């Protein structure tokens, strides 16, 4: 079994996975698994009202997570995904409070890193819809740009 398939299986089993994106390493969980997502908040010491970004495999998944996709958002996704851009859109019923921090919106991103994309595609093959993630740095530590 390759590493990304093993990581996708771990996500489906409710475990946390570290994975690279083009900007940072992420700490991710199955975005539909409340207890797994809660472990991200616990591990990071992150307040529950701070939303997570849902990483998706392709633009086609936007409508799973967003109830409305304005034309400008679709155009931005076409132009800049995969890439380091997060779209903030009105959330659908799939985007639960435990991911969105009780916000009416959801942040969506298709990362431009071969490992992240392979992981997301393997996860989709297993029935996953998205990976809720944050940067792997601790909340109180400086970011790479601050160092």
Which sequence ranges carry the predicted segments?
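Active-site-adjacent structural elements in enzyme catalytic cores
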Residues: 1-139, 145
